[in-house]
């Protein structure tokens, strides 16, 4: 199956390689990170999928659509004030962050993940010279934090399709909220939302009946 976006024909099977490339993904030398607070090094999104509830979805969608109208810009602070930053980065931020979505679609997706999971991850793809090529919001089934012998942090993304990818934590933009008990992740919505969603479903069922 293929689709055309921004004048480029892509095959769904090639999207993973389009984002992460074909490089060596062997990270067997890494070990699980240990946190001082004793929390696990794995984050799994709330299995209740609050976005499946129409009320939660409508609220999130309203916020996401409004924030999707923002115009992101890259600027640099100098001794004489703020000046325009990289032209290529501004094109990525303001026009097409990646081949699969527009700037507004990118923002809407990031905001939706932020409110759904209290953690949104954006993979920063760079070329061999370190120049930013694209920004990809990542859908994931779980995220595991790992560390190497030099104490560099890595994140292993396990995706719904069974594939996984491990990258340096510095290679992602991690936006979080309800950043309280865990040292790295925003708290998941399982306990906070389950009771409210159950009550909301019960009220809807009572109205229908």
Predicted regions and their residues:
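Structured, contiguous alpha/beta core segments that scaffold functional sites
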Residues: 2-209
